[in-house]
């Protein structure tokens, strides 16, 4: 019943938003205009046309509903072989799929074609914290799990909650349910909790903490990227501290599952062209994103691993739907 309802609503949404002649390519933003998924479609779509990767402007269709589930259902059930369709996605997409939030649908029902920018994940402490490094924090948790509480801007089981747990997994820690986490309303509130001494650390995204970092309120003890973030070169990655974790709010696309490998690779190549363009570099600078380029099979492998890890942790936390 739930899937049938989603399908009916998705079909209605498509007709509501598709009253114009179709173009060669369409990008579905699974949200209302103005959000992150809408930004992904409009920026990538515009640049694809501007650099000549697409012969015609990319049509953007907004299809909000069910946290991205409405659009996902539409693609899987109605357009599984549409090679002219791309769909905006982010780390929220993979988290919801891993937690079975899309009415029983799974991540292997589409193909993840690429990500070309991200808001880096961070772990931060108050400026006067006793923890000088990520290793100090991890050692404290290993010695006494209840001694450290994290604050984050997502609910229990959300991506902010999962970031430090990924690090602890790499340290061999398995009792993740014993780690204290307080979900608050956004990164600023999480920082307030930490600076005020109510929690010992906060977990969030780089864009949320920049002003607090510049004011000297906090110290970032790890950025969860493969390499240090340009402009914040003094902040070490978790990887270089011995915990190979990449946890970023990536901006990317998926495509229908049943398109051919050649069609999949063509979209991957076009995304790489966008990633390499000065237009995209400017778009990232204007919107607080850091470079994060994975396309084609490399990105699909990254997503597969991410979904598997999140599914395991979510089951242990009891948040799988």
Language-model-detected regions and their locations in the chain:
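Bacterial N-terminal signal peptides that target proteins for export
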Residues: 1-9
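N-terminal (or domain-start) structured segment
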Residues: 23-108, 173-201, 293-294, 316-321
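Periplasmic-binding protein-like
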Residues: 115-122, 222-257
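An extracytoplasmic/periplasmic, membrane-proximal ligand-sensing/linker region
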Residues: 261-321
């Amino acid at each position: 019943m739930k899937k049938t309802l989603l399908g009916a609503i998705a079909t209605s949404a498509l007709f509501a938003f598709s009253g114009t002649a179709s173009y060669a390519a369409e990008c579905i933003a699974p949200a209302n205009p103005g959000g992150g998924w809408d930004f992904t479609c409009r920026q990538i779509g515009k640049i694809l046309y501007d650099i000549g990767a697409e012969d015609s402007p990319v049509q953007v269709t907004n299809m909000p509903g069910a946290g991205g589930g409405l659009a996902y259902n539409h693609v899987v059930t109605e357009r599984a072989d549409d090679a002219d369709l791309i769909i905006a996605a982010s780390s929220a997409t993979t988290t919801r799929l891993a937690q079975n939030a899309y009415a029983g649908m799974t991540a292997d029902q589409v193909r993840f074609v690429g990500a070309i920018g991200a808001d880096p994940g961070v772990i931060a402490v108050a400026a006067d914290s006793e923890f000088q490094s990520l290793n100090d924090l991890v050692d404290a948790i290993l010695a006494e799990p209840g001694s450290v509480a994290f604050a984050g801007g997502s609910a229990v089981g959300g991506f902010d909650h999962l970031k430090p747990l990924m690090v602890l997994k790499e340290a061999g820690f398995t009792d993740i349910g014993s780690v204290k986490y307080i979900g608050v309303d956004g990164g600023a509130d999480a920082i307030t909790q930490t600076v005020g001494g109510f929690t010992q650390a906060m977990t969030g995204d780089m864009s949320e903490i920049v002003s607090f970092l510049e004011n000297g309120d906090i110290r970032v003890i790890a950025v969860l990227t493969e390499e240090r973030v340009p402009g914040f070169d003094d902040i070490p990655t978790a990887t270089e501290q011995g915990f190979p974790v990449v946890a970023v709010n990536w901006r990317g696309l998926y495509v229908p599952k049943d398109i051919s490998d050649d069609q999949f690779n063509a979209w991957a190549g076009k995304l790489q062209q966008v990633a390499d363009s000065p237009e995209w570099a400017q778009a990232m600078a204007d919107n607080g994103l850091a470079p994060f380029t994975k396309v084609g099979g490399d990105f699909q492998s990254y997503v597969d691993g991410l979904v598997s890890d999140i599914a395991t942790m979510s089951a242990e936390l009891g948040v799988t739907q």
